[in-house]
């Protein structure tokens, strides 16, 4: 009965109402998920020091790298599950759920162990100085192993949402974030545990979230759940998961590479070692604010995903078009609001993270520059998610790479040569706006597919 109700809503509910029902929990979930890192940065910047904040920023490339593999499995499996449910193929959806467990185990073991062993040389490579390295090491020694649980919590939270439980997925993230915030405060202030306390708080929250999410798929009433018969390894299913998940994986992986490029640029173009360390901390603050906006946008796009995936699988192309149009419009609004707030109140935003006047002065100027491209980025992210949701992974990968690598890397190589440290900041809006332009061209060129007859459009559905 519950399964029929979820399926009927995806197929027949009015799109604005359906998108609201899916997007609100997804937005809360993604924004709350971003609070893992943001809350750590606020408590560390305010409760430890500005160099501890910079040390935390140095860890981003490693953490983004590890999270990329969770996104590979979670995003890929969730899209496949929603499409298969649209095709009324629940047994195959449950086999996809089971194979995602194997894939998560393998990817996490193969990535966590090397990152832990080579932690110090990696941090040095990523721009750590003698002032920031001890803080970065202390944090990662706890958080790297905990990312094993984060991969399951993120991946299966996405599948939970895609299979018709957006509110429960939201509750999971709220619970986890609340635990993280409370423990952050207790460990850093009353107990005086510093950055190590923040790491322990994050690790505990990750473990609890993973247990809660996985427990859902053992419940008899779940639309898809773990069944012993479904745990048959299938290379076809693994390929289908990775083919779709490769787009967000590439986006996250290039995000890691971008962080490395940015940090190395700060080291190269800072006038003193102290300025370089502060610039890395400033980038951490700017990334935190930008992450909040992007996660808000991504939440709407993720709310769109099961609607688009199901209706694409069910050959209801008019509903696919409507879901995309409403999502893109909503995200453009969020983009502009985030941009406007940063332009009007940059110092207030920066002061949330630090009381250091040199860091506040540097970051206030940098924030106004770096956030300019965010004004239209909601359209680019929504378009990327559309292509990912209907299985067009190559287009989604290309769009992901345009924003974070294809345009940003050349900008980082060229602009700082003429503008110095300011050129590093200007590379961010230049690459964002160029990526938006590419997204406009691609959606116009592919719109005929979504305007075609229901049967013809569905024939383009990628197979396992």
Show the residue positions of the predicted features.
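Short alpha-helical transmembrane segments in multi-pass integral membrane proteins
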Residues: 1-23, 81-148, 179, 190-246, ...
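Transmembrane helical elements of multi-pass membrane transporters/channels
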Residues: 21-40, 142, 176, 205-209, ...
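Transmembrane alpha-helix boundary and packing residues in multipass membrane permease domains
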Residues: 26, 30, 42, 79, ...
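Helix-terminus/linker motif at the lipid-water interface of multi-pass membrane proteins
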Residues: 35-53, 123-130, 186-193, 253-286, ...
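Small-residue-rich hydrophobic transmembrane alpha-helices
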Residues: 53-113, 150-169, 263, 282-340, ...
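Residue-level signal for short hydrophobic patches within transmembrane helices
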Residues: 16-35, 39, 62-69, 106, ...
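Hydrophobic positions within alpha-helical transmembrane segments of bacterial inner-membrane proteins
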Residues: 31-35, 75-77, 108-116, 151-155, ...
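Short runs within selected transmembrane alpha-helices of multi-pass transporters and secretion channels
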Residues: 74, 143-161, 169-177, 198-213, ...
């Amino acid at each position: 009965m519950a399964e029929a109700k979820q399926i009927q809503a995806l197929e027949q509910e009015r799109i604005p109402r359906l998108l609201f029902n899916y997007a609100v929990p997804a937005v809360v979930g993604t924004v709350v998920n971003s609070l893992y890192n943001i809350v750590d940065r606020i408590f560390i910047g305010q409760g430890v020091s500005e160099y501890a904040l910079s040390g935390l920023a140095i860890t981003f490339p490693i953490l983004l790298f590890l999270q990329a593999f969770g996104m590979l499995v979670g995003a890929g499996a969730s899209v496949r599950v929603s499409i298969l449910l649209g095709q009324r193929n629940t047994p195959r959806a449950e086999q996809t759920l089971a194979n995602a467990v194997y894939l998560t185990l393998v990817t996490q073991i193969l990535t966590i162990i090397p990152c832990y062993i080579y932690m110090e040389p990696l941090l040095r490579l990523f721009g750590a100085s003698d002032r920031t390295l001890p803080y970065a090491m202390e944090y990662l020694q706890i958080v790297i192993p905990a990312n094993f649980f984060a991969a399951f919590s993120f991946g299966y939270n996405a599948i939970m949402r895609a299979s018709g439980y957006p509110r429960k997925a939201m509750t999971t993230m709220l619970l986890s974030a609340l635990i993280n915030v409370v423990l952050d405060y207790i460990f850093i202030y009353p107990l005086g545990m510093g950055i190590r306390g923040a790491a322990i708080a994050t690790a505990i929250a990750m473990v609890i979230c993973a247990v809660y999410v996985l427990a859902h798929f053992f419940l008899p009433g779940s639309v898809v759940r773990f069944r012993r018969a479904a745990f048959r390894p299938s290379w076809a299913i693994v390929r289908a998961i990775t083919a779709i998940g490769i787009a967000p994986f590439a986006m996250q992986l290039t995000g890691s590479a971008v962080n490395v490029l940015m940090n190395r640029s700060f080291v190269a173009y800072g006038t003193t070692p102290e300025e370089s360390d502060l610039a890395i901390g400033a980038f951490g603050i700017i990334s935190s604010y930008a992450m909040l906006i992007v996660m808000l946008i991504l939440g709407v796009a993720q709310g769109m995903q099961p609607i688009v995936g199901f209706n694409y699988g069910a050959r209801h192309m008019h509903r696919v078009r409507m879901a995309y149009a409403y999502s893109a419009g909503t995200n453009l609004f969020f983009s502009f609001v985030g941009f406007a707030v940063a332009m009007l109140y940059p110092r207030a935003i920066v002061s949330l993270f630090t009381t250091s006047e040199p860091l506040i002065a540097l970051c206030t100027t940098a924030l106004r520059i770096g956030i300019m491209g965010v004004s239209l980025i909601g359209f680019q992210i929504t378009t990327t998610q559309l292509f990912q949701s209907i299985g067009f992974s190559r287009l989604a990968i290309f769009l992901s790479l345009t924003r974070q690598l294809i345009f940003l890397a050349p900008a980082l190589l060229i602009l700082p040569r003429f503008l110095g440290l300011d050129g590093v900041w200007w590379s961010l809006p230049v690459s964002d706006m160029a990526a938006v332009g590419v997204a406009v061209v691609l959606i116009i060129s592919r719109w005929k597919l979504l305007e075609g007859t229901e049967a013809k459009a569905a024939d383009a559905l990628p197979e396992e």
